[in-house]
């Protein structure tokens, strides 16, 4: 019997609208980019599937201005100051066999810088991490979440985001 592995494939869909002088909105970017699922992301997904971790689902989508090439060993956006992570809302989680669609809406006043990089991560607290515990009124320990980036990609045609532009970033993930 041959051992067969099923790859996790993913794409990032970036769709941007720009306000026009007459009040209408025009699509100025509609790109689909193949992403790189990073090593820690693969580990987190497999641990979640195997119920080794109780949490581990994708919770945030982020954008940043770093031009550092995407690599499997990365664990976060590479931008040092211009970046923003947004929480994926329940209504923005859609599964249509065989693809999972996760999206966030970056409004006109959010993330107004050049978007060179896009990423998705789990930002929940792992069951093995420290939790907040009170004995009476004394704080005995403190939670320190350690986000796990699943995938990151650098856009070869970056968006220059301004207050006249609204963007939806959608991650599409599928096995096979």
Predicted regions and their residues:
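Small cysteine-rich, disulfide-bonded extracellular modules of the LU/uPAR three-finger superfamily
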Residues: 1-115, 123-176
């Amino acid at each position: 019997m041959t051992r067969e592995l099923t790859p996790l494939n993913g794409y990032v869909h970036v769709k941007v609208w720009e306000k026009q002088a007459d009040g209408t909105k025009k699509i100025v970017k509609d790109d689909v980019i193949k992403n790189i699922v990073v090593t820690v992301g693969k580990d987190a997904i497999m641990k979640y599937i195997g119920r080794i971790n109780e949490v581990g689902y994708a919770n945030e989508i982020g954008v940043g201005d770093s031009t550092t090439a995407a690599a499997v060993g990365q664990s976060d956006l590479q931008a040092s100051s211009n970046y923003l992570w947004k929480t994926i809302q329940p209504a923005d989680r859609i599964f249509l066999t065989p693809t999972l669609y996760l999206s966030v809406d970056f409004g006109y006043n959010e993330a107004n810088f050049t978007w060179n990089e896009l990423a998705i991560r789990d930002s929940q607290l792992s069951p093995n991490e420290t939790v907040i515990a009170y004995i009476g009124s004394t704080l005995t320990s403190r939670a320190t979440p350690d986000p796990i980036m699943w995938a990151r990609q650098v856009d070869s045609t970056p968006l220059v985001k301004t207050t006249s532009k609204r963007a939806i970033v959608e991650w599409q993930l599928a096995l096979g």
